[in-house]
Regions:
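Long, amphipathic, charge-rich alpha-helical segments that form helical bundles/coiled-coils
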Residues: 98-112, 154
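Juxtamembrane interface at the cytosolic side of transmembrane helices
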Residues: 163-181
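Alpha-helix boundary/capping detector
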Residues: 78, 130, 156, 160-163, ...
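Juxtamembrane/start-of-transmembrane alpha-helix segments at the extracytoplasmic/lumenal side
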Residues: 141-161
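Inter-heme linker and motif-flanking segments adjacent to c-type heme-binding CXXCH motifs
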Residues: 1-75, 79-82, 86-96, 110-121, ...
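Juxtamembrane amphipathic/hinge helix adjacent to a transmembrane helix
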Residues: 106, 114-148
């Protein structure tokens, strides 16, 4: 749904109409449109909700809950992206999980738009799929990094075996040269 559609179905729509104020202007201002951020849901200075809702009120609690959902999804996405980028930097093939992780970024964008419905259930419908994708991508990244460590250990062991064989051959050649004299 579009932000305006979500807002028109929200409880805030009716209240703002009764107050005679345009819905968007209450949170986003009228002429000096504020840059949007997740902080608009917080209880801090940049909060759009704190102007009308105390942190302990139902509206304040909903804003905190919605912010928590957004932060969880954003953190999950960033954590998965970081582990996949580490694996990619190490030379491992992670293009498919990185591509799939784009779904989590899309879910984050949709979740931020779903805030305009002021309904945790609507927000959760966007957040949950993104969390699943992020968790799956993170697990694949960790598995890839584990595989990298396995490969490195295998390389070290095979290098030691080859070194031992080379040293053995050198010693055998010297031994044969001494006998030949």
């Amino acid at each position: 749904m579009v932000n305006a559609e979500l807002f028109s179905k929200s409880p805030h729509s009716k209240i703002f109409i009764q107050m005679g104020v345009p819905g968007c202007a209450v949170c986003h201002s009228n002429h000096a449109i504020f840059e949007t951020s997740d902080a608009m849901l917080s209880a801090g200075d940049k909060s759009a909700c704190a102007a009308c809702h105390a942190p302990t009120s139902a509206g304040g609690a909903l804003a905190a809950s919605m912010l928590g959902s957004i932060v969880r999804l954003k953190s999950g996405y960033e954590k998965a992206l970081a582990v996949l980028k580490n694996a990619e930097h190490a030379g491992m093939e992670v293009s498919q999980p990185l591509f799939e992780l784009n779904e989590a970024k899309t879910a984050l964008i949709k979740a931020r738009a779903a805030i305009h419905g002021f309904d945790q259930a609507i927000l959760d419908k966007e957040v949950e799929p993104g969390l699943k994708v992020s968790d799956k991508a993170y697990a694949r990244g960790v598995k890839t990094l584990d595989e990298l460590q396995y490969r490195r250990k295998g390389l070290a062991i095979s290098a030691l075996i080859i070194l031992a064989l080379v040293v053995g051959l050198i010693l055998k050649i010297r031994q044969m040269e001494r006998k030949a004299k």
